[in-house]
A protein has these predicted regions:
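Short pocket-lining segment of the protein kinase catalytic domain that shapes the ATP-binding cleft
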Residues: 38, 64-72
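Short beta-strand micro-motifs within the conserved protein kinase catalytic domain, predominantly
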Residues: 50-62
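The N-lobe alphaC helix and its flanking beta3-alphaC-beta4 segment of protein kinase-like domains
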Residues: 27-44
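An alpha-helical support segment within catalytic cores of ATP-dependent transferases
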Residues: 98-145, 150, 155
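ATP-binding glycine-rich loop module of kinase domains
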Residues: 6-32
Length: 233
């Protein structure tokens, strides 16, 4: 198999006509969630690699198999230099929120909110208002949960989205706010966010900064800069 990318969470390979995502940790529920979310999105006409199967070696490894698509990588610079591409991203995120999902899904409250609070703890400023706001949000629509440009790409000029690891029931507007929170606010001339979504973008940029500090990522300076651009005066 050909290694495509590697992270702390997983390794991705190409195996002929298939894309293989091997989780580095034994978390069956995570594999199950990603498979279900990917398959559901695909069924709703979202352009995403088709889920094939999950290979399980008990207590050892989990491998999710998808069809391989020759996706062209994208960067934030690509989006900022192409207003049509930015519009395409927004349209895709709006379409994601229309996906029907299990209304009894508690992943937002049982995992994501707790993870956000933990990431706030790595920041050297008071984040209580951020935490209170996050806890006040009501999960009501399907969300991808990690909508950065690095989980998107182009296939024949059509936008592809993948890595539905956090696919779940979440707050309306979350995916759009998340995507915008990965970009310096000053670089976006038309970001089409409501006041509530702007508030979410500010908080998400703080979460992403805390996450970078937690993981000691090289992106800490740029994420700090992005947070400062979204921070309310």
């Amino acid at each position: 198999m050909e290694l495509i990318r590697k992270s702390n969470w997983s390794c991705a390979y190409r195996d002929g006509d298939e894309f293989v995502k091997q989780l580095n940790f034994w978390v069956p529920e995570a594999a199950e969630r990603e498979a279900k979310a990917s398959d559901t999105a695909y069924g709703y006409g979202i352009l995403t690699p088709k889920y094939i199967s999950t290979e399980i070696v008990p207590d050892v490894s989990l491998c999710l198999r998808y069809e391989y698509l020759p996706i062209k990588k994208l960067s934030n610079e690509d989006v900022l230099s192409d207003s049509k591409l930015l519009s395409q991203v927004i349209e895709l995120l709006d379409k994601l929120s229309e996906i029907k999902w299990d209304n009894s899904d508690t992943y937002w409250d049982s995992f994501l909110v707790k993870e956000f609070d933990y990431e706030f703890s790595f920041l050297n400023f008071n984040t209580q208002k951020y935490s209170d706001f996050i806890h006040s949000l009501i999960p009501s629509v399907f969300i991808h949960g990690d909508c950065s440009i690095y989980n998107m790409g182009l296939l024949d000029n059509n936008l592809v989205i993948f890595d539905f690891q956090h696919g779940s029931l979440g707050p309306e507007g979350w995916d759009k706010a998340y995507f915008m929170a990965t970009i310096n606010r000053n670089a976006i001339s038309n970001y089409c966010l409501s006041d509530r979504e702007k508030r979410m973008a500010e908080i998400i940029s703080a979460i992403r900064l805390g996450r970078a500090i937690k993981k000691n990522l090289k992106e800490i300076p740029i994420r700090r800069e992005i947070y400062e651009s979204w921070k309310s005066i």
